[in-house]
Amino acid sequence: MDPFHNGNKRSSISFGSSQRQPYNKNNYLSGTNGPSSAAQDQGRGPSPFGMSGNTTNGGNSKRNSGCDLSATYYASRSPMYSPLDFSPPVFSPNHSQLQQARGYAANIPVVSNLMNPSMASVCEYQSHYPLFGLDWSADDYVCLGSYKEDSRNKLQVLHSNDLLSWESVVDADVVYPVSKIQWVPSQLYPRKLATCSDSLRIWSVSPEERQFQEQINLSLCKYNRQHPANPAAADDMKVIGTFPPITSFDWNTVDTNLIISSSIDTTCIVWDLQSSHYVKTQLIAHDSEVFDVRFLTKSTQLFASCGGDGSVRVFDLRSLAHSTIIYEPPSSSVSGATAGTITPSSKGSDALLRLEPSPYDPNVLATFAADSNKIIILDMRNPESPILNLQGHGSSVNGIKWHPTKRNVLLSCGDDCQVLYWDLNSSFMEINAAGSKSPSIHGTSLEDPDGDTEMTDGGAGSGLNEDPLSLNNNSKQVCKTLETPNMMYANKTQEINNIAWRPQRGDWFGCVSGKKFQNVRVL
């Protein structure tokens, strides 16, 4: 969602303004006759964050009904993350959801569908609030974050013993909707999670004692360090509302004292929770807003970011004077921008919204752009050009997650009310057969046949060969497009805003749409 562009398209990932536009590609859930009716937000609506740090949520919106039945529609929007749209999904009036799914993808197994509950196991929890934020812990606690236009948002923790019913065990009030939630990796006790919105916060969670408390506001600590003569209190929203909002963050899985965050002010910050100053380093990462940042797999030194300039960049904390651009949009519109100058991404831009490094091959990353139904698979051994494009969604992609235990399996969700399951191993085998450097289909990188990842960051295996920022760009290859997923899950009523795998085994995934959280067994 883009907290800095007023707008009322609240589904998927934007605070941005919304316009209905023809989208010609067939999707699994819409017939050729188009939708029968729609209630789509067209006006300019409130934004949780003002450009100048205003914390008020003023604004009006209007609704228009009716649509042209000659085409399928999707909603265009500017980047970042905003979850909610209560308008009906784009379905043909003459076919059921399941029929349409089978009609457009007869060979795709349905993971589960609420119209036929016997096909698979689905459990749902109905919240009182529209939902966007989502993460699943190792001991089956799920944290949900609301998205409301006023200043009364919630964090809610659910728990289930059998994954067939969920109980709300504790919640906390927040002012602004969170754009990301993450439980601390590989740690059950004490339970902690982080969230980002106006600030980056660490929370302490004790369901047994019914306690959910903010432990530290890292953005506020940074501010008070810079203003020792006039520090701000934890509840001083007049000050906190002026901070550059945090668009995303990532908790390092090797050293959980390290967190990296991205912001709309073009910077990324590496935080050290053991340091008295908390800020380890801050750098200008892009020429415009930075929308996501992630540590590369098994590394404490290497990280990648994406942003409004449409590029993916790789950094090494040991040498921040240089970075490597591993992907740029085919026609870059930001070539004239100066580093450190904020260039807000415009509607229809190539802004990349989310980045997902593979948990098994640190050379491989997935990303997607604003207003796009395409997922881009990148390999740092073949920079600048994607190795694979996934175009199975019928509307804009909202989220992507690699499977936690299965190699080269990706989950995606979108405005077409679908979750798609992609097994990319066969596609990578075809790339391998073509003789290009490409992702491994086994347990290690292709350039590491003995199973040993090279050590490039002081003991943590990064999996990158030699200098990770000295990439070989000699072998160009034609990017393959994959349009048919292996499995799909169709939500009957609303766009799917976010997804998360059950981290232990990946036998279930969770998704949020509207006010509903669902967990679905993957057969």
Curated annotation (Swiss-Prot):
It comes from the Eukaryota. The modification Phosphoserine is found at residues 47, 65. Disulfide bonds: none annotated. It is found in: Cytoplasm; Nucleus. Residues 9-40 have a biased composition (Polar residues). Residues 1-64, 436-472 are annotated as: Disordered. Residues 52-64 have a biased composition (Low complexity). Keywords: Cytoplasm, Nucleus, Phosphoprotein, Repeat, WD repeat. Present with 799 molecules/cell in log phase SD medium. This is WD repeat-containing protein YPL247C.
